[in-house]
């Protein structure tokens, strides 16, 4: 393991809540509906993040907790029953309905697990109900997916059939390319979790080999282990290096010759390196500070240092699972400073003191930092963009080179004007 400096902070945080993950999960499973039990603020957050108007009838919605619910003057369970009945009558195509807890529903101790259990009995054979928490009280926004997947695991049937299970939401076109490569390697039985249809859950067991596509699925991994699955230890498929090592780890688990992997990946790697050059010219030697928000920070730091030659000032992450991140940490340069958790005021002080060329942070911090003359990149963009895989390396680098390129153009125009 590289000699990395680990630090831990606690204090005020600045993050989105887990409800945000509904935006990509509802697109992934078009036969599912996500019903948030929360406030008007929850409703505005998801609608804004998804970029759709509510009259378009998206596959998510909010059962609004009014002041009388929060004050205990009304039976929230009865009101929720009414909302669910109306929803299913209006949308009979729904196959799985996720009841998603929020900060307000947790504050009033609304028992969504019991609600889901009762609804499953009432709508048996018609709609399946599961519940999880999207509250941001103790979690960050990507952990919403972790909660959703964990809630589905008890519904997965058992099977001892050997298979590769890709765990974590990917863009459909990226997933298709990954599966094609695995089949070329000789791995034919490949499934994904979450699936593209919520009712087509993969069967799992002792011969299921799990390969993670996202680093924020700690609870999901733990429950898959309890079901007997084998977790393949690998970096995450971001950039050329991470993706190559990811495929190599899968090949090793299935006893496939390493030379075959290099033979199949070589054309992809060569094209990706050429495409990466123009971005590398912008990023090389620039100083990078990553504030904690998505749990993608360590993988991004590895990619931006090793493949784009950026200098790492500090790598923040909201939560660090050293077992899952072991292979990523091994690829970081010596003396990398990793800070788990957040005291946002102290971290902002360190940002100002170090004056980096680029800060990766949440949307709430970006504008204030830009006003101070510090270039930023929203970390949430990494989750909404198809960035996984060798052939996406240039697109991933482009997300970071774009703000620096923009600043160069603005600086040049300012100099010309003066």
Swiss-Prot record:
Cofactor: record remark: Binds 1 [4Fe-4S] cluster per heterodimer. The cluster is bound at the heterodimer interface by residues from both subunits.
Entry keyword Zinc: no
Q: Binding of [4Fe-4S] cluster: at which residues?
A: 17, 42, 103
Q: What is its EC number?
A: 1.3.7.7
Similarity comment: Belongs to the BchN/ChlN family.
**Task of the protein:** Component of the dark-operative protochlorophyllide reductase (DPOR) that uses Mg-ATP and reduced ferredoxin to reduce ring D of protochlorophyllide (Pchlide) to form chlorophyllide a (Chlide). This reaction is light-independent. The NB-protein (ChlN-ChlB) is the catalytic component of the complex.
Entry protein name: Light-independent protochlorophyllide reductase subunit N
Gene assigned in the entry:
chlN
């Amino acid at each position: 393991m590289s000699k990395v400096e680990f630090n831990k902070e606690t204090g005020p945080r600045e993050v989105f809540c887990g409800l945000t993950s509904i935006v990509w999960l509802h697109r992934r499973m078009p036969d599912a509906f996500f019903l948030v039990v929360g406030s008007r603020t929850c409703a505005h957050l998801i609608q804004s993040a998804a970029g759709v108007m509510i009259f378009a009838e998206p596959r998510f919605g909010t059962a609004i907790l009014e002041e009388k619910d929060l004050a205990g003057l009304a039976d929230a369970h009865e009101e929720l029953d009414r909302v669910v009945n109306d929803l299913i009558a209006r949308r009979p195509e729904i196959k799985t309905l996720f009841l998603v807890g929020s900060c307000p529903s947790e504050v009033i101790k609304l028992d969504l697990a019991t609600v889901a259990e009762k609804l499953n009995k009432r709508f048996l054979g018609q709609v399946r109900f599961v519940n999880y928490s999207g509250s941001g009280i103790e979690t960050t926004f990507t952990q919403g997916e972790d909660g959703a997947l964990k809630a589905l695991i008890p519904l997965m049937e058992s099977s001892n059939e050997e298979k590769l299970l890709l765990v974590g939401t990917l863009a459909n076109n990226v997933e298709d390319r990954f599966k094609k490569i695995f089949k070329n390697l000789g791995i034919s039985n490949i499934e994904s979790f979450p699936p593209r249809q919520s009712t087509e859950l993969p069967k799992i067991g002792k011969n299921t080999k799990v390969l993670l596509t996202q680093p924020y699925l700690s609870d999901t991994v733990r429950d898959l282990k309890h079901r007997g699955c084998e977790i393949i230890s690998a970096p995450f498929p971001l950039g050329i290096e991470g993706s190559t090592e990811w495929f190599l780890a899968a090949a090793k688990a299935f006893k496939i010759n390493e030379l075959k992997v290099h033979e199949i990946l070589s054309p992809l790697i060569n094209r990706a390196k050429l495409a990466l050059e123009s971005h590398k010219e912008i990023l090389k030697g620039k100083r990078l500070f990553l504030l904690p928000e998505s749990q993608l920070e360590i993988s991004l730091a590895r990619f931006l240092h090793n493949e784009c030659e950026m200098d790492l000032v500090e790598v923040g992450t909201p939560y660090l699972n050293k077992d899952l991140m072991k292979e990523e940490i091994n690829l970081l340069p010596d003396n990398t400073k990793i800070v788990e958790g957040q005291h946002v005021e102290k971290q902002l002080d360190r940002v100002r003191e170090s004056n980096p060329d680029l800060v990766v942070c949440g949307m709430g911090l970006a504008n204030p930092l830009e006003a101070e003359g510090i270039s930023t990149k929203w970390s949430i963009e990494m989750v909404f963009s198809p960035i996984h895989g060798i052939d996406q390396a240039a697109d991933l680098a482009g997300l970071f080179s774009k703000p620096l390129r923009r600043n160069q153009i603005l600086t040049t125009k300012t100099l010309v004007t003066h």
